[in-house]
């Protein structure tokens, strides 16, 4: 039971980040590698703020807005400086490595085990029934993930959200509506990286420490979650894409845990497993698309 809870907990955390990747990959068709930097940015800022006595609750929205700023930088480099999308993300991701170290006080690892977090505080320790306490982490994570999902669903149904979708499908349509397609892309990248930073902040609070390598492979996990979720659950017409992405993140985490449990590979091979599963998902996804096109 504890293992299953752990899978759900990590799946929900990465689902928040995957919602951001959904914006860049599925909506904007933008290969944004800066999430590998904004994810640890949120973790570093959260750890730094909590160590300085800031409320762990306030640390999360501040982490989100830090990610928004980083996403804006990626967008400005791409739109205003005319740098290719892939390179824009790489530049910001690389720069954020140093930024994250500075935020963490030039420490590659910043623990805050003795500080309160959203998961471990006076309220969770003393005000909850004993029967609920083992599940408090997954409950809080589910609430945060669902809030992010519903906010994103709401935004995508606003005028700005429709323009964001149009910018990915047909940017000429955005121009015909007298809107700046570059500005729309910047907004999309800002929101996406905001989600990534928020997820990093949540993970840092769950682990009660920040590590500089926490963002390695974040983009791969996000892509796998988006592709797995949207491809596997696309047959359910009434299921929203954001719901499919969250389910995909949890399912992907289960796949990784299953492979490790088989003892064929070691836990230290986690990144290798992650990459291999993503490759398998991409191959199967491409095969399904070809079959669909052939039958059509």
Listing of model-derived features with the role each one plays in the protein:
Residues 3-55, 60, 77-81, 227-238, ...:
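Single transmembrane alpha-helix segments in multi-pass membrane proteins
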Residues 10, 86-87, 108, 137-138, ...:
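Loop-to-transmembrane alpha-helix initiation sites
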Residues 21, 54-94, 145-146, 248-252:
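Alpha-helical transmembrane segments within multi-pass membrane transporters and channels
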Residues 66, 76, 91-118, 123-125, ...:
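Alpha-helical transmembrane segments in inner-membrane proteins
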Residues 70, 131-214:
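Helix-loop-helix "hairpin" substructures at the membrane interface of multi-pass membrane proteins
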Residues 85, 91-92, 96-157, 187, ...:
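Transmembrane helix-bundle core of multi-pass membrane transporters
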Residues 169-183, 236, 243, 255-296:
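Cytosolic-side transmembrane-helix boundaries in multi-pass membrane proteins
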Residues 196-272:
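Transmembrane alpha-helical segments in multi-pass inner-membrane proteins
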């Amino acid at each position: 039971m504890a293992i299953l809870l752990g899978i759900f907990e990590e799946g929900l955390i990465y689902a928040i980040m995957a919602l951001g990747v959904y914006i860049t990959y599925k909506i904007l068709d933008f290969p944004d590698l800066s999430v590998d930097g904004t994810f640890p940015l949120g973790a570093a800022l959260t750890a730094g703020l909590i160590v300085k006595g800031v409320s762990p609750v306030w640390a999360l929205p501040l982490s989100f807005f830090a990610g928004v700023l980083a996403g804006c930088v990626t967008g400005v480099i791409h739109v205003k400086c005319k740098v290719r999308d892939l390179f824009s993300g790489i530049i910001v991701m690389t720069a954020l490595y140093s930024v994250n170290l500075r935020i963490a006080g030039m420490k590659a690892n910043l623990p805050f085990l003795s500080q309160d977090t959203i998961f471990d505080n006076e309220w969770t320790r003393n005000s909850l029934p004993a029967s609920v306490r083992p599940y408090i982490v997954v409950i809080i994570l589910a609430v945060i993930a669902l809030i992010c999902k519903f906010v994103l669903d709401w935004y995508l149904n606003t005028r700005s959200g429709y323009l964001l979708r149009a910018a990915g499908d047909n940017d000429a349509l955005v121009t015909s509506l007298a809107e700046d397609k570059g500005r729309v892309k910047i907004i999309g990248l800002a929101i996406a990286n905001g989600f990534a930073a928020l997820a990093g902040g949540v993970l840092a609070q769950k682990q009660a420490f920040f590590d500089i390598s926490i963002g390695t492979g974040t983009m791969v996990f996000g892509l796998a979650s988006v592709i797995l979720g949207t491809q596997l659950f696309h047959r359910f017409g009434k299921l929203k894409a954001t719901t499919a992405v969250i389910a995909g993140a949890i399912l992907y985490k289960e796949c990784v845990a299953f492979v490790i449990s088989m003892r064929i590979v070691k836990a230290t091979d986690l990144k290798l497993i992650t990459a291999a599963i993503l490759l398998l998902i991409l191959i199967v996804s491409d095969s399904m698309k070809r079959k669909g096109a052939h039958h059509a």
